[in-house]
């Protein structure tokens, strides 16, 4: 027996509602996109290359739909009508909905200091809040050196990996002053709900510093490691690392690397490079306890010395707070964006990176102009 017109209408309305409720990364026009990547510029003298350069809110954008180079954004990070704001606004619109899972974590969490006037240099020089210059302090080493935001309904969700201190605000979109001075990176990925279990495992290894979260009971039952991570539990003992494959909504494969604080080694030299079977060129924050090149390794990591994105004037690694890497071999076109640094002090911190094999993204992120090397 066929459905009545009223029943058909109800099913159609339900379908519309479910489509509307599903979460996705958003592009620069506010449309769904499977994944995108960002390179934010440090404060530089305005050279006309990208809007907001002198104010520290200029950035370049690339996504899987356009498969091009890093494109200068006409909108600044302070604007509400750009990809990052559009993406996070989905959560903000539903922040009071207790059926929605979310977690925001940051080794320099929002609210640890006022975001109205604090600059990153002030964070780095303050013993109480610094996770960079006083790595032996208990408040620094207890949690992973990891930053991100995740939100899911029962259908799909978003994982935004980034390097920005004091970001994001848990109730509304705003880009913090702490993110102005230095370069930063971000990676947004859209996943089906089934991938949340694996993501939760990686958080369990990382032990993130969580400052906002809600985990519905039914989702907690599906995702045991996630529930433990939200509750403040973390991986103890072996194994000290976890490497997983994540499949995005559109079927793209990302490899996520997570280490616990007991890993006690560099993530890139010890885990990422040998797993991907390629040398890496890495850009991270490096101050005071840099890792020497280990040229005896089969696959090793070189460090960036200068970065040149688009037509923006090249800048030194000392002006960059990004956490990114790409393979040295373009025939193995890996790009990684994450949240942990190449510093010996980070050996005892949880953290990780997320990598994809993509020729167009490799070309887009081949922005490291000079590097140290074993020659």
Swiss-Prot record:
Hydrolyzes DNA under acidic conditions with a preference for double-stranded DNA. Implicated in apoptosis. The lineage of its organism: Eukaryota, Metazoa, Ecdysozoa, Nematoda, Chromadorea. It catalyses: Endonucleolytic cleavage to nucleoside 3'-phosphates and 3'-phosphooligonucleotide end-products. GO terms for cellular component: lysosome; nucleus. It comes from Caenorhabditis elegans. The keyword Transferase does not apply. This is Deoxyribonuclease-2. The keyword Electron transport does not apply. It is an enzyme of class 3 (hydrolase).
